[in-house]
Curated annotation (Swiss-Prot):
One of its GO terms (molecular function) is unfolded protein binding. Belongs to the chaperonin (HSP60) family. Keywords: ATP-binding, Chaperone, Cytoplasm, Isomerase, Nucleotide-binding. It is found in: Cytoplasm. This is Chaperonin GroEL 3. ATP binds at residues 30-33, 51, 87-91, 415, 495. It catalyses: ATP + H2O + a folded polypeptide = ADP + phosphate + an unfolded polypeptide. It is an enzyme of class 5 (isomerase). Gene3D superfamilies: GroEL (3.50.7.10), GroEL-like equatorial domain (1.10.560.10), TCP-1-like chaperonin intermediate domain (3.30.260.10). GO terms for cellular component: cytoplasm.
Length: 552
């Protein structure tokens, strides 16, 4: 086992504070509309330019083990805030740095670290309650756009695009952000349910120019096993032909005689038909077939339920206004499912999302939820260079997460004003002077984000903070973009309460642990063994001299 290096009390805390400061100073320059960029060297490819706090934090690794421990603890603050709220990582880092710095001074002055932490926790729960109480619910699309614009660093086009996407797919809908192949940023909305399976044979195509199969007012047969025997399918095919409506078959696979017969009938014009494989695998496939059944008002034909294909009538088939099938995707628009059944299924999936612990399962369940609840929107981020696209994609991701958080819990005035105001309404009372000192530490820390935003904009931080606190208006603040004071909500500068709350809670949690640290243990640096370095003695200067006259 390697030898360990142990540091105690003041020495340990000072090293750790140095690490906290290095990381926080690199992250906090990105805060606010006038925040600066950070350039990150990559081992391959072009350097990355970003204004995303958590991306900067994740890149920092310090040489000194003790300083690195401090930096990594604060990095954890940014990551945690990012995981829960998706934005506010820089605010969380600034708050954590302030609490650690003030806490370090208090401990050095002889205060009890445990009581300081209790005071910090009391103040934080008080502030969180105030924030939630003062939050305003989002009602209009304009408010959604405002949140997106602020989180996207003042880029109005980003805010508008996110608001438009949310309007089209609903708050539950899936909105994904991808890199575009062009210079333009665009929004594409897929309404209805789309899954990534295309037609089984190109002969099913109805539009040869676009190579898609479009079925209007179609019946949908959902079968969970393979279809290879034509005989079993005949009754249902004959019933559909009588109605002269098209038919879409979704099953594990259609092969052999069954597929050949369907293709021949399609080509002869007797039957408008298309077949696709069912989406997903295993249990997920069953669940997705059930989703499609509920959406279209049909039934999954399954041996487990004792339903044989021979006995299937038209009433067991789903219906949809339009089905569009390309080589890779199938989209079902306007299914005939009952609204209450779809809502019941949505509630069931939401319950599963809350219960699952796996991120992968959660993501897949959310995709299913979106397909049932309204559709999928894709924002394709474009730019002139790859570096620009990556930087903009970071901002769009942040803006999207912030907007979701705002819809969920409401909004408060932005620009650090909500925290600054909350510092005035902390009513918590400490049980002793050390706890009261902990409460004061939080009160001072709550000014840090507003001060940093002002400093990044080139304003005098203490004057800005003083001016905001002097004014009694709850939404009065400093617009760093224009350098004006005024009503933050009227100016459209708002923050999601979830982002502000999470940033403070995570910052205080980790900062409290750092303040109460008394010893630190790290692996001791290995001493170089004597005489190990350098070349063996006799190989000095011209050891290879005799090769001069060789002819090549």
């Amino acid at each position: 086992m390697a030898a360990k290096d142990v540091k105690f009390s003041r020495d340990a805390r000072e090293r750790m504070l140095r690490g906290v400061n290095i990381l926080a100073d690199a992250v906090k320059v990105t805060l606010g509309p006038k925040g600066r960029n950070v350039v990150i060297d990559k081992s391959f490819g072009a350097p990355r330019i970003t204004k995303d706090g958590v991306t900067v934090a994740k890149e920092i690794e310090l040489e000194d083990k003790f300083e690195n421990m401090g930096a990594q603890m604060v990095r954890e603050v940014a990551s945690k805030t990012n995981d829960i709220a998706g934005d506010g990582t820089t605010t969380a880092t600034v708050l954590a740095q302030s609490i650690v710095q003030e806490g370090h001074k208090a401990v050095a002055a002889g205060m009890n670290p445990m009581d300081l932490k209790r005071g910090i926790d009391l103040a934080v729960s008080d502030v969180v309650w105030t924030l939630i109480k003062n939050a305003t619910k989002i009602k209009t699309s304009e408010e959604v756009a405002q949140v997106g614009t602020i989180a996207g660093n003042g880029d109005e086009s980003v805010g508008k695009m996110i608001a438009e996407a949310m309007q089209k797919v609903g708050n539950e809908g899936v909105i994904t952000v991808e890199e575009a192949k062009t210079a333009e940023t665009e929004l594409e909305v897929v309404e209805g349910m789309q899954f990534d399976r295309g037609y089984l044979s190109p002969y099913f195509v109805t539009n040869a120019d676009k190579m898609v199969a479009d079925l209007e007012d179609a019946y949908i047969l959902l079968h969970e096993k393979k279809l290879s025997n034509l005989q079993a399918m005949l009754p249902v095919l004959e019933a559909v032909v009588q109605t002269s409506k098209p038919l879409l078959i979704i099953s594990e696979d259609v092969e052999g005689e069954a597929l050949a017969t369907l293709v021949v009938n399609k080509l002869r014009g007797g039957l408008k038909i298309a077949a696709v494989k069912a989406p997903g695998f295993g249990d997920r496939r069953k669940a997705m077939l059930e989703d499609i059944a509920i959406l279209t008002g049909g039934q999954v034909i399954s041996e487990d339920l004792g339903i044989k294909l021979e006995n299937v009538g038209l009433d067991m088939l789903g219906r949809a206004k339009k089905v569009s099938i390309s080589k890779e995707n199938t989209t079902i628009v306007d299914g005939a499912g009952k609204k209450e059944e779809i809502q019941g299924r949505v509630a069931q999936i939401k319950q599963q999302i809350e219960e699952t612990t796996s991120d992968y399962d959660k993501e897949k369940l959310q995709e299913r939820l979106a397909k049932l609840a309204g559709g999928v929107a894709v924002i394709r981020v474009g730019g002139a260079t790859e570096v620009e696209v990556k930087e903009k994609k970071d901002r769009v991701d942040d803006a999207l997460n912030a907007t979701r958080a705002a819809v969920e819990e409401g909004i408060v005035p932005g620009g650090g004003v909500a925290l600054l105001r909350a510092s005035l309404s902390i009513n918590a009372v400490g049980a002793n002077s050390d706890q009261t000192a902990g409460i004061s530490i939080v009160r001072r820390a709550l000014q840090a984000p507003a001060r940093q935003i002002a400093a990044n904009a080139g304003a005098e931080a203490s004057i800005v903070a003083g001016k905001i606190l002097e004014n009694k208006g709850a939404t009065f603040g400093f617009n760093a973009q224009t350098g004006e004071y005024g009503d933050m909500i009227a100016m459209g500068i708002v923050d999601p309460v979830k982002v502000v709350r999470t940033a403070l809670q995570d910052a205080a949690s980790v900062a409290g642990l750092l303040v109460t640290t008394e010893a630190m243990i790290a692996e001791a640096p290995k001493k170089e063994s004597a005489g190990g370095g350098g070349m063996p003695g006799g190989m000095g200067g011209g050891g290879m001299g005799g090769m001069g006259g060789m002819d090549f």
